[in-house]
Amino acid sequence: MVENNYLCWQVTCKSIYMRISLLLFCIFSLFSSLSRGSSIPFSPIVRSYSVSDYNAGIQNWSITQDDRGVMYIGNNKGLLEFDGNSWELHELPSRNIVRSVYIGKDGKIFVGSFEEFGYFERNSLDSLVYHSLKDEAKDFRFHNDEIWTITSAHGEIVFQSFGSLFFYDGHTVKGIRTKTLPLNLFQVGDTVYSQQINGGLFILAKNGLENLIERKLLGNSDVVAGLPYDGGVLFLTQKSGGFVYQNGKIQKWHTECDAELEKYSVNRAVMTKDSCYIIGTLSNGIYAIDKEGRLLWKENTDSRLQNNTVLGLYCDADNNVWAALDEGIAYIQNNSLVYYYEPPYRKIGMVYDVLVKEDEAYIASNQGLYRIRNRVPELVPGLEEQAWFVGEWGKQ
């Protein structure tokens, strides 16, 4: 009886060991394949947050993070604070939408709304208290000014509406009506750029906006984001894809999904620490593209996003990606060692082994051996029965 129990224990331990070994093998095989541009369309794990989680408005507009790792999201109901465990809503006195969020070097959380802007600051009890800056804009008459972007330039915090710019130096606020109509502001390195409505791309200099690139050189489309690219800048347009600007010259940035980006309208973009470009669209979710233009993964409502309209993107200190959506918030674990592949159909069955090569991959399952080329799985003829192992012998 003791011998039988010992044998059962041995079998059980061996079974557990084999399962753990297989799991670890699959995890590291899949992870290593990501860096090689595998033929399998691996995707990161996505965590979705809905209204029932954060108890505020459906729409979310912008995201940032403080040096403690706390996330702040501009929401239809105000400013959301998330410490990784619990959510807290901070309303503006006007209870208006918070469109834009930005954290200054001093830790102040600047926010923009309709004819309102200011900052939240922690008091001695570690609670956030709001300070309005609107009334500091002396002799400025507000007229439907909604603050869509906040950034820093030349030692000042800059608030942007579609017709005005406001500059806060830490003491006073100066508001100016611009001759052109700024669509946005975005910073690359020490330079702040501004796309003009129905116009070209400008630089925000100390003495105002200066024309940089004519609209026709950017596909006659609005630039919605700028990101570092090999010592230059990658400008992403809403309808004409990307353009690389280096040494005063501009050229098209080609990707595997140019047609989709042009069709679904680029709206936001960020770059991860490992130089992956995360691009959010207005109608088809999020694309992850490497510097060479290869599609690494994409997420939309056909996969794990709860909404396809991306209104804000942020790459956090851990290299994970947050998306402010037209409905909810998405947390994409870009920095995880675990990625996964979900076949377009379930005929693959139980997976026992995986072999990943540069241009193809093989999956051994209880339904046979599958080969994946160009992201499409197909059953290998003659191997339609259960397969436990797949490996290489020589070059085969």
Question: For each of these PLM feature ranges, what is it?
Answer:
Residues 1-396:
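Carboxylate-rich, polar loop motifs that coordinate divalent cations or form catalytic acidic clusters
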